[in-house]
Amino acid sequence: MSLHTFGSGRLTAQVDSLGAQLRSLCLDDVEFLWNAADPWNWSAPVLFPLISGLPGDELQHNGQRYSIPSHGFARRSEWAVLEDGRFELAASEATRVQYPFEFRLQVGFTVTDRLTVTHEVHNDGDEPLPYLLGGHPAFRWPLPGATGEHEVSWSQGGESMRQAVGGLRPGRIPSPAIDGRLVLQKSYFAEDALLFDDLQPKAVTYTAPGAARLTLRYDDFAVLGIWSKSQGADFVCIEPWSGYPAPQGFDGDITMLPGIELLSAGQTHTFSYSIAIEGA
C-alpha cells in the first residue's frame, strides 16, 4: 500500500493504493473525511463488482457458485498505480475464483475547485460483464465548526425511498425528508441506509450552521445512499451507486440480477462523481 497526494490550491486529497480508497479530503488543511477509526474502519471504499452482498455471499454464473464478500473485492485489493496517476485493478487468479470474468477497473482522482472521482469499467472478456459499482465516501459528522443540526438537502424528489436489510426490500416507504431537507438523526440508520433514486438534479448538499457546505454530484449513477451507524459513529456516508443491491431472496445467475450493469465485450463504461467544499 502507498499514499498518493492530489492537490490544487486550497483543496487536497490523499488516496491509498490499497483499495484505491480516498483517505483524506482537506480544504485549507481542515479534514472533512472520516478517519477510518472504529467502529467503521473505512473512509471511502470502492464497491465492485457488488453493492452490498448476495444471499449466502455466493455469486452464481453458468451453473457454478463462487464465494464473494459483501461489496465485492475491490476495496480489499492492492491496485496498480499507472503512469498518469490513475489506479487500476484487473482480473487475476485471485479475482476469478470469486468473479469469473475478465475486467479492468480504473479510478482517477482530479482536484480542481472540487474533487472528481472517475471510474472506467473495461470488459476484456468475450461475454457481457455483469457488475455493480459504487462510491462510499464517509464525511465527518459533526462537521468542523458546526454549531447545530446537520442536514442533507436537494432540489426535487426524495419523498419516498427504499431500504436494503438482508437484501433490497420490496416496495417503497415514506422518506423522513421534508421538502428536500433531511435533518440527520442516528435513529434513521437503525435499519441500514436510506436509498433514493429520484433526486433531481443528481446533487445533494451536506452542511450545518457554522460549517462548510459539501456538495456531491453523481450524474452517472442511478441511486444515492445515505448511511451511518446508528450508534457510536461520527460520520455519515453519501454513496453514489450504479444500481440497487440484490433483492431479498435472490437466487439466480448474476446476469439476471435486477439492475445489474451488463457491459458488452470490448466496451468501456465511465462513472464519475464530484465533491465540492465551500468554506463556512
What are these regions (language model features)?
Residues 64, 68-112:
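Extended, loop-rich substrate-binding clefts of extracytoplasmic carbohydrate-active enzymes
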Residues 1-30, 255, 276-280:
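Generic N-terminal segment detector
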Residues 93-139, 144:
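Acidic, contiguous internal or C-terminal segments within carbohydrate-active enzymes
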Residues 11, 27, 66, 71, ...:
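Acidic/His-leaning functional-site neighborhoods
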Residues 106-108, 258-263:
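Beta-strand-rich interaction surfaces with strong enrichment in secreted/lumenal proteins
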Residues 12-65:
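Acidic-aromatic substrate-binding/catalytic surfaces of carbohydrate-active enzymes
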Residues 59-66, 261-278:
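Short Pro-Gly-centered flexible turn/kink motifs
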Residues 130, 138-220:
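Active-site/ligand-binding surface loops and adjacent short beta/alpha elements
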